[in-house]
A protein has these predicted regions:
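Helix N-cap/coil-helix junction residues
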Residues: 66-67, 231, 391, 412
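A helix-coil-helix interface module used to build multimeric assemblies
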Residues: 9-215, 220-226, 288, 417-447
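A short structural micro-motif
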Residues: 77-85, 243-246, 402-407
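Short, well-ordered beta-strand elements within core beta-sheets of diverse protein domains
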Residues: 59-67, 180, 250-258, 381-390
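Charged, flexible cofactor/metal-binding loops and thiol motifs
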Residues: 133-139, 144-145, 159, 165, ...
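Glycine-rich cofactor/substrate-binding loops
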Residues: 10-53, 114, 277, 292-486
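Charged/polar positions within long, soluble alpha-helices
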Residues: 59, 63, 84-91, 109, ...
Length: 486
Protein backbone atom coordinates (compact mmCIF):
# COMPACT_ATOMS: atom_id res chain seq x y z
CA UNK A 1 0.00 0.00 0.00
CA UNK A 2 1.72 3.20 -1.11
CA UNK A 3 1.38 5.71 1.69
CA UNK A 4 3.97 8.28 0.79
CA UNK A 5 2.73 11.77 0.21
CA UNK A 6 3.08 12.36 -3.49
CA UNK A 7 5.27 15.41 -4.00
CA UNK A 8 2.95 18.09 -5.23
CA UNK A 9 4.70 21.37 -4.79
CA UNK A 10 1.82 23.11 -6.39
CA UNK A 11 -1.17 21.62 -8.02
CA UNK A 12 -2.30 24.55 -10.09
CA UNK A 13 -5.80 23.90 -11.15
CA UNK A 14 -8.50 25.58 -13.00
CA UNK A 15 -11.62 25.77 -10.88
CA UNK A 16 -12.34 22.09 -10.49
CA UNK A 17 -14.61 20.75 -13.18
CA UNK A 18 -16.34 18.38 -10.80
CA UNK A 19 -17.74 21.00 -8.47
CA UNK A 20 -16.26 24.26 -9.76
CA UNK A 21 -19.48 25.84 -11.04
CA UNK A 22 -19.82 28.24 -8.13
CA UNK A 23 -16.11 29.06 -7.80
CA UNK A 24 -14.23 31.99 -9.33
CA UNK A 25 -10.67 31.04 -8.38
CA UNK A 26 -8.66 27.87 -8.73
CA UNK A 27 -8.04 25.79 -5.63
CA UNK A 28 -4.78 26.51 -3.83
CA UNK A 29 -2.11 23.94 -4.73
CA UNK A 30 -0.96 23.26 -1.18
CA UNK A 31 -4.55 22.93 0.01
CA UNK A 32 -5.24 20.49 -2.78
CA UNK A 33 -2.18 18.42 -2.02
CA UNK A 34 -3.20 18.32 1.66
CA UNK A 35 -6.64 17.05 0.72
CA UNK A 36 -5.76 14.61 -1.98
CA UNK A 37 -2.21 13.40 -2.36
CA UNK A 38 -2.23 10.90 0.50
CA UNK A 39 -5.89 10.19 -0.13
CA UNK A 40 -5.41 8.99 -3.69
CA UNK A 41 -2.54 6.76 -2.56
CA UNK A 42 -4.94 5.13 -0.11
CA UNK A 43 -7.79 5.08 -2.61
CA UNK A 44 -5.75 2.76 -4.83
CA UNK A 45 -6.98 -0.06 -2.58
CA UNK A 46 -10.56 0.92 -3.41
CA UNK A 47 -10.36 1.13 -7.22
CA UNK A 48 -11.86 -2.31 -7.88
CA UNK A 49 -14.77 -1.69 -5.49
CA UNK A 50 -15.42 1.78 -6.84
CA UNK A 51 -15.71 0.41 -10.37
CA UNK A 52 -17.96 -2.45 -9.30
CA UNK A 53 -20.18 -0.03 -7.41
CA UNK A 54 -20.43 2.13 -10.51
CA UNK A 55 -21.31 -0.85 -12.68
CA UNK A 56 -24.21 -1.67 -10.37
CA UNK A 57 -25.29 1.97 -10.12
CA UNK A 58 -25.36 2.39 -13.91
CA UNK A 59 -27.33 -0.87 -14.36
CA UNK A 60 -29.85 0.53 -11.87
CA UNK A 61 -30.06 3.92 -13.62
CA UNK A 62 -30.90 2.09 -16.87
CA UNK A 63 -33.38 -0.28 -15.25
CA UNK A 64 -35.21 2.68 -13.71
CA UNK A 65 -35.22 4.58 -16.99
CA UNK A 66 -33.14 7.38 -15.49
CA UNK A 67 -30.65 7.04 -18.34
CA UNK A 68 -31.18 5.32 -21.67
CA UNK A 69 -30.12 1.68 -22.03
CA UNK A 70 -27.82 2.65 -24.89
CA UNK A 71 -26.12 5.31 -22.76
CA UNK A 72 -25.78 2.81 -19.94
CA UNK A 73 -24.22 0.28 -22.30
CA UNK A 74 -21.58 2.77 -23.36
CA UNK A 75 -20.78 3.77 -19.79
CA UNK A 76 -20.60 0.12 -18.74
CA UNK A 77 -18.17 -0.82 -21.48
CA UNK A 78 -16.02 2.20 -20.62
CA UNK A 79 -16.10 1.11 -16.97
CA UNK A 80 -15.08 -2.39 -18.07
CA UNK A 81 -12.13 -0.91 -19.97
CA UNK A 82 -11.03 1.01 -16.86
CA UNK A 83 -11.54 -2.16 -14.81
CA UNK A 84 -9.27 -4.09 -17.16
CA UNK A 85 -6.61 -1.41 -16.99
CA UNK A 86 -6.85 -1.34 -13.19
CA UNK A 87 -6.62 -5.15 -13.08
CA UNK A 88 -3.34 -4.91 -14.97
CA UNK A 89 -2.12 -2.30 -12.48
CA UNK A 90 -2.06 0.35 -15.17
CA UNK A 91 -4.67 2.70 -13.76
CA UNK A 92 -2.99 5.21 -11.47
CA UNK A 93 -4.92 7.85 -9.61
CA UNK A 94 -4.25 11.51 -10.30
CA UNK A 95 -4.27 13.60 -7.11
CA UNK A 96 -5.49 16.56 -9.13
CA UNK A 97 -8.76 14.63 -9.38
CA UNK A 98 -9.06 14.33 -5.57
CA UNK A 99 -10.09 10.72 -5.18
CA UNK A 100 -10.82 7.38 -6.78
CA UNK A 101 -14.42 8.32 -7.55
CA UNK A 102 -13.53 11.31 -9.69
CA UNK A 103 -10.60 9.50 -11.28
CA UNK A 104 -12.85 6.67 -12.43
CA UNK A 105 -15.53 9.06 -13.64
CA UNK A 106 -12.94 11.11 -15.56
CA UNK A 107 -11.47 7.97 -17.16
CA UNK A 108 -14.93 6.82 -18.23
CA UNK A 109 -15.87 10.25 -19.55
CA UNK A 110 -12.66 10.32 -21.60
CA UNK A 111 -13.97 7.19 -23.36
CA UNK A 112 -17.62 8.26 -23.66
CA UNK A 113 -19.21 11.64 -23.03
CA UNK A 114 -22.12 9.73 -21.48
CA UNK A 115 -19.78 9.23 -18.52
CA UNK A 116 -21.10 12.62 -17.42
CA UNK A 117 -24.42 10.94 -16.59
CA UNK A 118 -22.86 8.26 -14.40
CA UNK A 119 -23.03 10.31 -11.22
CA UNK A 120 -26.78 10.93 -11.46
CA UNK A 121 -28.53 10.21 -8.14
CA UNK A 122 -25.43 9.57 -6.07
CA UNK A 123 -22.70 11.43 -4.23
CA UNK A 124 -19.09 10.68 -3.45
CA UNK A 125 -20.28 10.45 0.14
CA UNK A 126 -22.40 7.36 -0.41
CA UNK A 127 -19.84 6.12 -2.91
CA UNK A 128 -16.94 6.15 -0.47
CA UNK A 129 -19.08 4.55 2.20
CA UNK A 130 -19.97 1.84 -0.33
CA UNK A 131 -16.35 1.32 -1.38
CA UNK A 132 -15.07 1.03 2.17
CA UNK A 133 -17.85 -1.40 3.13
CA UNK A 134 -16.99 -3.52 0.10
CA UNK A 135 -13.31 -3.35 1.07
CA UNK A 136 -14.17 -4.27 4.66
CA UNK A 137 -16.19 -7.31 3.62
CA UNK A 138 -13.17 -8.72 1.80
CA UNK A 139 -10.85 -7.62 4.59
CA UNK A 140 -12.99 -9.31 7.25
CA UNK A 141 -12.99 -12.47 5.16
CA UNK A 142 -9.23 -12.36 4.60
CA UNK A 143 -8.44 -11.62 8.24
CA UNK A 144 -10.81 -14.42 9.27
CA UNK A 145 -8.98 -16.78 6.92
CA UNK A 146 -5.67 -15.73 8.50
CA UNK A 147 -7.11 -16.36 11.98
CA UNK A 148 -8.39 -19.77 10.90
CA UNK A 149 -4.89 -20.53 9.64
CA UNK A 150 -3.54 -19.53 13.04
CA UNK A 151 -6.03 -21.86 14.72
CA UNK A 152 -4.95 -24.65 12.38
CA UNK A 153 -1.33 -24.02 13.30
CA UNK A 154 -2.22 -24.31 17.01
CA UNK A 155 -3.87 -27.65 16.24
CA UNK A 156 -0.72 -28.73 14.40
CA UNK A 157 1.47 -27.61 17.28
CA UNK A 158 -0.69 -29.42 19.83
CA UNK A 159 0.26 -32.71 18.19
CA UNK A 160 3.67 -32.32 19.85
CA UNK A 161 1.82 -32.56 23.16
CA UNK A 162 4.02 -32.71 26.23
CA UNK A 163 3.92 -31.45 29.78
CA UNK A 164 3.86 -27.66 29.80
CA UNK A 165 4.06 -25.05 32.54
CA UNK A 166 1.38 -22.53 33.44
CA UNK A 167 2.11 -19.25 35.16
CA UNK A 168 0.29 -16.71 37.22
CA UNK A 169 2.09 -13.44 37.93
CA UNK A 170 4.86 -14.89 35.70
CA UNK A 171 5.60 -17.33 38.54
CA UNK A 172 5.26 -21.09 37.98
CA UNK A 173 1.70 -22.11 38.84
CA UNK A 174 0.60 -25.65 37.98
CA UNK A 175 1.60 -28.23 35.40
CA UNK A 176 -0.53 -28.50 32.31
CA UNK A 177 0.11 -29.63 28.76
CA UNK A 178 1.05 -28.11 25.43
CA UNK A 179 -2.37 -29.13 24.13
CA UNK A 180 -3.97 -27.25 27.01
CA UNK A 181 -1.98 -24.12 26.09
CA UNK A 182 -2.86 -24.43 22.40
CA UNK A 183 -6.52 -24.99 23.26
CA UNK A 184 -6.63 -21.82 25.37
CA UNK A 185 -5.36 -19.70 22.48
CA UNK A 186 -7.66 -21.48 20.08
CA UNK A 187 -10.58 -20.39 22.30
CA UNK A 188 -9.41 -16.77 22.19
CA UNK A 189 -9.26 -16.82 18.41
CA UNK A 190 -12.70 -18.40 18.24
CA UNK A 191 -14.06 -15.28 19.94
CA UNK A 192 -12.13 -13.07 17.52
CA UNK A 193 -13.72 -14.92 14.62
CA UNK A 194 -17.15 -14.61 16.18
CA UNK A 195 -16.76 -10.86 16.60
CA UNK A 196 -15.71 -10.54 12.96
CA UNK A 197 -18.70 -12.59 11.80
CA UNK A 198 -21.07 -10.40 13.77
CA UNK A 199 -19.47 -7.26 12.38
CA UNK A 200 -19.71 -8.61 8.83
CA UNK A 201 -23.50 -8.57 9.12
CA UNK A 202 -23.45 -4.88 10.02
CA UNK A 203 -20.98 -4.04 7.26
CA UNK A 204 -22.98 -6.00 4.72
CA UNK A 205 -25.67 -3.34 4.21
CA UNK A 206 -25.57 -1.17 1.13
CA UNK A 207 -25.31 2.63 1.57
CA UNK A 208 -25.48 3.33 -2.18
CA UNK A 209 -28.39 5.65 -2.92
CA UNK A 210 -27.98 7.63 0.29
CA UNK A 211 -26.59 10.49 -1.79
CA UNK A 212 -24.72 13.29 -0.08
CA UNK A 213 -26.77 13.10 3.12
CA UNK A 214 -30.51 13.23 2.50
CA UNK A 215 -31.06 10.66 -0.23
CA UNK A 216 -32.37 11.62 -3.65
CA UNK A 217 -35.69 12.34 -5.30
CA UNK A 218 -34.71 10.26 -8.32
CA UNK A 219 -36.70 7.06 -8.57
CA UNK A 220 -33.78 4.78 -7.72
CA UNK A 221 -33.99 1.11 -6.73
CA UNK A 222 -31.75 0.56 -3.74
CA UNK A 223 -32.78 -3.06 -3.29
CA UNK A 224 -31.56 -3.81 -6.79
CA UNK A 225 -28.10 -2.26 -6.33
CA UNK A 226 -27.80 -3.90 -2.92
CA UNK A 227 -28.54 -7.26 -4.52
CA UNK A 228 -26.13 -6.74 -7.44
CA UNK A 229 -23.35 -5.96 -4.98
CA UNK A 230 -24.11 -8.90 -2.69
CA UNK A 231 -25.39 -6.87 0.28
CA UNK A 232 -28.12 -8.27 2.52
CA UNK A 233 -30.18 -5.05 2.22
CA UNK A 234 -29.86 -1.30 1.71
CA UNK A 235 -29.03 0.76 4.80
CA UNK A 236 -32.07 2.31 6.44
CA UNK A 237 -31.31 6.04 6.66
CA UNK A 238 -29.21 8.17 4.28
CA UNK A 239 -27.91 10.59 6.92
CA UNK A 240 -26.92 7.66 9.13
CA UNK A 241 -25.33 5.91 6.15
CA UNK A 242 -22.94 8.72 5.27
CA UNK A 243 -22.57 9.88 8.88
CA UNK A 244 -21.60 6.48 10.25
CA UNK A 245 -18.56 6.27 8.01
CA UNK A 246 -15.67 5.45 10.31
CA UNK A 247 -17.82 3.75 12.92
CA UNK A 248 -17.62 0.31 11.34
CA UNK A 249 -13.95 0.95 10.65
CA UNK A 250 -13.37 1.72 14.34
CA UNK A 251 -15.32 -1.39 15.28
CA UNK A 252 -13.22 -3.54 12.97
CA UNK A 253 -10.02 -2.02 14.35
CA UNK A 254 -11.17 -2.67 17.91
CA UNK A 255 -11.76 -6.33 17.02
CA UNK A 256 -8.43 -6.48 15.25
CA UNK A 257 -6.80 -4.97 18.32
CA UNK A 258 -8.24 -7.70 20.55
CA UNK A 259 -7.11 -10.34 18.08
CA UNK A 260 -3.65 -8.74 18.00
CA UNK A 261 -3.62 -8.73 21.82
CA UNK A 262 -4.19 -12.50 21.62
CA UNK A 263 -1.44 -12.87 19.04
CA UNK A 264 0.79 -10.76 21.26
CA UNK A 265 0.08 -13.05 24.23
CA UNK A 266 1.06 -16.10 22.19
CA UNK A 267 4.20 -14.32 20.99
CA UNK A 268 5.12 -13.22 24.52
CA UNK A 269 4.76 -16.76 25.88
CA UNK A 270 7.10 -17.97 23.15
CA UNK A 271 9.60 -15.22 23.99
CA UNK A 272 9.51 -15.93 27.73
CA UNK A 273 9.68 -19.70 27.37
CA UNK A 274 12.53 -19.44 24.88
CA UNK A 275 14.26 -17.20 27.40
CA UNK A 276 13.93 -20.02 29.96
CA UNK A 277 15.19 -22.47 27.30
CA UNK A 278 11.99 -24.50 27.48
CA UNK A 279 11.22 -23.64 23.86
CA UNK A 280 13.73 -23.86 21.04
CA UNK A 281 13.10 -21.12 18.48
CA UNK A 282 13.00 -22.16 14.83
CA UNK A 283 15.96 -20.89 12.78
CA UNK A 284 13.55 -19.78 10.05
CA UNK A 285 11.76 -17.45 12.45
CA UNK A 286 14.67 -16.07 14.52
CA UNK A 287 17.47 -13.65 13.87
CA UNK A 288 21.05 -13.25 15.03
CA UNK A 289 23.06 -10.38 16.43
CA UNK A 290 25.48 -8.33 14.36
CA UNK A 291 27.90 -8.30 17.30
CA UNK A 292 27.21 -11.25 19.59
CA UNK A 293 27.78 -14.49 17.69
CA UNK A 294 25.91 -16.69 20.16
CA UNK A 295 22.58 -14.90 19.86
CA UNK A 296 19.30 -16.23 18.56
CA UNK A 297 16.61 -13.61 18.92
CA UNK A 298 12.82 -13.93 18.73
CA UNK A 299 12.46 -10.87 16.46
CA UNK A 300 9.26 -11.82 14.60
CA UNK A 301 7.54 -12.62 17.88
CA UNK A 302 8.60 -9.30 19.34
CA UNK A 303 7.38 -7.52 16.23
CA UNK A 304 3.94 -9.15 16.49
CA UNK A 305 3.80 -7.75 20.03
CA UNK A 306 4.96 -4.37 18.78
CA UNK A 307 2.38 -4.32 16.03
CA UNK A 308 -0.39 -5.00 18.56
CA UNK A 309 0.52 -1.62 19.97
CA UNK A 310 0.29 -0.05 16.52
CA UNK A 311 -3.17 -1.58 16.15
CA UNK A 312 -4.31 0.05 19.38
CA UNK A 313 -3.06 3.36 18.00
CA UNK A 314 -4.98 2.84 14.76
CA UNK A 315 -8.14 2.00 16.68
CA UNK A 316 -7.80 5.12 18.83
CA UNK A 317 -7.17 7.14 15.67
CA UNK A 318 -10.36 5.86 14.03
CA UNK A 319 -12.48 6.02 17.18
CA UNK A 320 -11.34 9.57 17.86
CA UNK A 321 -12.77 10.69 14.52
CA UNK A 322 -16.28 9.83 15.66
CA UNK A 323 -16.62 12.35 18.44
CA UNK A 324 -17.15 16.05 17.99
CA UNK A 325 -18.38 15.84 14.42
CA UNK A 326 -21.95 16.90 13.70
CA UNK A 327 -24.53 14.80 11.85
CA UNK A 328 -24.10 14.35 8.12
CA UNK A 329 -20.91 13.86 6.15
CA UNK A 330 -17.64 15.46 7.28
CA UNK A 331 -14.28 15.06 5.60
CA UNK A 332 -12.75 14.06 8.95
CA UNK A 333 -14.01 10.59 8.06
CA UNK A 334 -11.56 10.39 5.16
CA UNK A 335 -8.86 9.89 7.82
CA UNK A 336 -10.42 6.59 8.87
CA UNK A 337 -9.25 5.10 5.58
CA UNK A 338 -5.60 5.28 6.64
CA UNK A 339 -6.31 3.48 9.92
CA UNK A 340 -8.47 0.88 8.22
CA UNK A 341 -6.00 -0.04 5.48
CA UNK A 342 -2.99 -0.06 7.81
CA UNK A 343 -4.87 -2.09 10.41
CA UNK A 344 -6.00 -4.78 8.01
CA UNK A 345 -2.53 -5.18 6.51
CA UNK A 346 -0.90 -5.29 9.95
CA UNK A 347 -3.33 -7.92 11.22
CA UNK A 348 -3.03 -10.17 8.19
CA UNK A 349 0.78 -10.11 8.25
CA UNK A 350 1.00 -10.73 11.99
CA UNK A 351 -1.42 -13.67 12.06
CA UNK A 352 0.26 -15.21 9.07
CA UNK A 353 3.76 -15.00 10.57
CA UNK A 354 2.61 -16.62 13.80
CA UNK A 355 0.71 -19.33 11.93
CA UNK A 356 3.85 -20.25 10.01
CA UNK A 357 6.25 -20.06 12.96
CA UNK A 358 4.31 -21.88 15.68
CA UNK A 359 4.33 -25.43 14.28
CA UNK A 360 8.14 -25.19 13.98
CA UNK A 361 8.68 -24.63 17.71
CA UNK A 362 10.55 -27.36 19.56
CA UNK A 363 10.35 -28.16 23.25
CA UNK A 364 12.99 -29.25 25.74
CA UNK A 365 10.98 -31.61 27.94
CA UNK A 366 13.73 -32.09 30.52
CA UNK A 367 13.97 -28.34 31.01
CA UNK A 368 10.19 -28.09 31.28
CA UNK A 369 10.09 -30.76 34.02
CA UNK A 370 12.92 -28.98 35.82
CA UNK A 371 11.07 -25.66 35.58
CA UNK A 372 7.99 -27.24 37.14
CA UNK A 373 9.97 -29.02 39.86
CA UNK A 374 11.88 -25.84 40.72
CA UNK A 375 8.60 -23.99 40.90
CA UNK A 376 6.97 -26.61 43.20
CA UNK A 377 4.20 -26.76 40.65
CA UNK A 378 2.52 -29.76 42.32
CA UNK A 379 2.04 -28.10 45.72
CA UNK A 380 -1.68 -27.60 45.03
CA UNK A 381 -2.00 -31.29 44.14
CA UNK A 382 -0.27 -32.17 47.40
CA UNK A 383 -2.65 -29.98 49.42
CA UNK A 384 -5.59 -31.52 47.56
CA UNK A 385 -4.33 -35.01 48.38
CA UNK A 386 -4.29 -34.15 52.09
CA UNK A 387 -7.73 -32.57 51.83
CA UNK A 388 -9.06 -35.72 50.16
CA UNK A 389 -7.76 -37.61 53.20
CA UNK A 390 -9.94 -35.47 55.47
CA UNK A 391 -7.63 -32.56 56.37
CA UNK A 392 -9.61 -29.29 55.95
CA UNK A 393 -8.30 -27.58 52.81
CA UNK A 394 -7.10 -24.47 54.65
CA UNK A 395 -5.02 -26.67 57.00
CA UNK A 396 -3.87 -28.84 54.09
CA UNK A 397 -2.77 -25.64 52.27
CA UNK A 398 -0.77 -24.63 55.35
CA UNK A 399 0.85 -28.06 55.74
CA UNK A 400 1.75 -28.19 52.02
CA UNK A 401 3.15 -24.64 52.31
CA UNK A 402 5.32 -25.78 55.22
CA UNK A 403 6.56 -28.75 53.19
CA UNK A 404 7.48 -26.43 50.28
CA UNK A 405 9.34 -24.11 52.70
CA UNK A 406 11.29 -27.05 54.06
CA UNK A 407 12.08 -28.33 50.56
CA UNK A 408 13.36 -24.90 49.48
CA UNK A 409 15.65 -24.78 52.50
CA UNK A 410 16.99 -28.28 51.79
CA UNK A 411 17.15 -27.69 48.00
CA UNK A 412 14.85 -30.63 47.44
CA UNK A 413 11.98 -31.20 44.99
CA UNK A 414 8.51 -32.39 45.99
CA UNK A 415 9.05 -35.53 43.91
CA UNK A 416 11.89 -36.51 46.28
CA UNK A 417 9.59 -36.64 49.31
CA UNK A 418 8.65 -39.99 50.85
CA UNK A 419 5.10 -40.92 51.77
CA UNK A 420 6.11 -41.52 55.40
CA UNK A 421 7.61 -38.01 55.69
CA UNK A 422 4.44 -36.41 54.36
CA UNK A 423 2.15 -38.65 56.44
CA UNK A 424 4.04 -37.66 59.59
CA UNK A 425 3.76 -33.91 58.98
CA UNK A 426 0.14 -34.07 57.81
CA UNK A 427 -1.10 -36.50 60.43
CA UNK A 428 -2.89 -38.67 57.83
CA UNK A 429 -1.83 -41.89 56.15
CA UNK A 430 -0.59 -41.41 52.58
CA UNK A 431 0.67 -44.25 50.38
CA UNK A 432 3.71 -44.03 48.07
CA UNK A 433 1.50 -44.47 45.03
CA UNK A 434 -0.85 -41.65 46.10
CA UNK A 435 2.04 -39.28 46.73
CA UNK A 436 3.70 -40.13 43.43
CA UNK A 437 0.45 -39.54 41.57
CA UNK A 438 0.10 -36.12 43.23
CA UNK A 439 3.62 -34.78 42.82
CA UNK A 440 4.64 -36.11 39.38
CA UNK A 441 4.79 -33.08 37.12
CA UNK A 442 4.83 -35.01 33.87
CA UNK A 443 1.45 -36.75 33.80
CA UNK A 444 0.57 -35.23 30.45
CA UNK A 445 -2.60 -37.22 29.89
CA UNK A 446 -4.02 -35.86 33.13
CA UNK A 447 -3.82 -32.33 31.77
CA UNK A 448 -4.86 -33.03 28.19
CA UNK A 449 -7.79 -35.43 28.42
CA UNK A 450 -10.44 -32.75 28.83
CA UNK A 451 -9.30 -30.55 25.96
CA UNK A 452 -9.84 -31.16 22.31
CA UNK A 453 -9.16 -28.69 19.52
CA UNK A 454 -11.83 -29.05 16.83
CA UNK A 455 -10.49 -29.91 13.38
CA UNK A 456 -12.50 -27.08 11.83
CA UNK A 457 -13.98 -24.02 13.47
CA UNK A 458 -17.68 -23.31 12.98
CA UNK A 459 -16.56 -19.98 11.58
CA UNK A 460 -14.85 -21.66 8.63
CA UNK A 461 -18.29 -22.56 7.32
CA UNK A 462 -19.61 -19.04 7.87
CA UNK A 463 -16.62 -17.64 5.98
CA UNK A 464 -17.19 -20.05 3.12
CA UNK A 465 -20.84 -18.96 2.89
CA UNK A 466 -19.87 -15.28 2.83
CA UNK A 467 -17.32 -15.81 0.06
CA UNK A 468 -19.86 -17.84 -1.93
CA UNK A 469 -22.46 -15.09 -1.59
CA UNK A 470 -19.99 -12.50 -2.89
CA UNK A 471 -19.08 -14.75 -5.83
CA UNK A 472 -22.76 -15.22 -6.66
CA UNK A 473 -23.32 -11.45 -6.60
CA UNK A 474 -20.34 -10.97 -8.93
CA UNK A 475 -21.89 -13.39 -11.39
CA UNK A 476 -25.25 -11.62 -11.18
CA UNK A 477 -23.69 -8.19 -11.73
CA UNK A 478 -21.75 -9.53 -14.69
CA UNK A 479 -24.96 -10.90 -16.20
CA UNK A 480 -26.78 -7.57 -15.78
CA UNK A 481 -23.86 -5.65 -17.28
CA UNK A 482 -23.68 -8.04 -20.25
CA UNK A 483 -27.39 -7.53 -20.95
CA UNK A 484 -26.78 -3.81 -21.40
CA UNK A 485 -23.45 -3.90 -23.24
CA UNK A 486 -24.19 -4.86 -26.80
N1 LIG B 1 -12.31 11.34 -0.48
C1 LIG B 1 -13.51 11.38 0.27
C2 LIG B 1 -13.44 10.44 1.45
O1 LIG B 1 -12.63 9.57 1.44
C3 LIG B 1 -14.66 11.00 -0.59
C4 LIG B 1 -15.89 11.79 -0.31
C5 LIG B 1 -15.62 13.20 -0.57
N2 LIG B 1 -16.76 13.98 -0.40
C6 LIG B 1 -16.70 15.30 -0.33
N3 LIG B 1 -17.78 15.92 -0.21
N4 LIG B 1 -15.55 15.93 -0.35
O2 LIG B 1 -14.17 10.58 2.37
Amino acid sequence: MPLEIIAMEQVKMMANKLWGGRFDKAADGEMYSFLSSENVALDTALIAYDIEGSLAHVCMLAKQGIIAKKEAGEILSALAAVQKKAGEGKFSLDPALEDVHTNVEAAVTAITANGKKMHTARSRNDQVSLDTRMYMRVAINEVSAALLELQASLLELSKKDCVFPTYTHTQVAQPASLLFWCHAHHCEIERDLERLSQLYARVNECPLGSGAVAGTTWNIDRNYTAKLLGFSAPTANPMDSVGSRGELEAELLSHLYLAMAHASKIATDVILLANKRLIVLPDEYSTGSSMMPQKKNPDPFELVRGKASRMLGLYVHAAGLLKSVPSGYNLDSQESKYALLQGVKTAEQSFSILAHALPLLKFDKEEIVLELEKGYACATELADLLAKKGVPFRSAHSVAGGIVKECIAKKKFLSALSASEVSAVAGVKITDAELKEAVSVDKVARFSAAYKIPAASAHAKALEARVKALDAAHALLEKEVKALVK
